[in-house]
Curated annotation (Swiss-Prot):
Source organism, top-level taxon: Viruses
Lineage: Viruses, Varidnaviria, Bamfordvirae, Nucleocytoviricota, Megaviricetes
Organism: Invertebrate iridescent virus 6
Name recorded for this polypeptide: Uncharacterized protein 094L
Length: 118
């Protein structure tokens, strides 16, 4: 990993921590439709893929999603579809990861957190 890539990785991690904090602060139990997004960043593993992805893309895998009753381990994999919208897929494959554009995800999560404010 080059020095520039390492710096970029640290910057992305910092941004995600700030967004995670914001999302959790805005969380209310009534907003059940947002729970998966809230906990999507609970335990992110961000690495830069050198093969098959552009430099601005990162891999995120092994997320935890939560519902009101219990904590379920799922692998939620973001991907961009042909219309530049994002969605997450539940996958039982523990090695399942996908390339995404972090700036896009950050933007969407910030929008999501705004909808959650009471």
């Amino acid at each position: 990993m080059s020095g520039g890539s390492l710096i970029n990785s640290i910057a992305i991690n910092t941004r995600i921590k700030k967004i995670k904090k914001s999302l959790l602060q805005n969380y209310t139990k009534e907003k059940t439709d947002m729970i998966k997004i809230l906990y999507l960043l609970s335990t992110p593993k961000i690495v830069i893929k050198n093969n098959g992805c552009f430099e601005k893309h990162y891999t995120i895998c092994n997320f935890i999603s939560k519902n009101q009753q219990n904590l379920n381990e799922n692998n939620l994999n973001f991907h961009l579809n042909g219309y530049d919208k994002y969605e997450y897929l539940s996958n039982n494959d523990k090695n399942a990861c996908t390339c995404i554009n972090m700036d896009f995800i950050v933007e969407r999560l910030m929008i999501s957190s705004e909808h959650m404010t009471v």
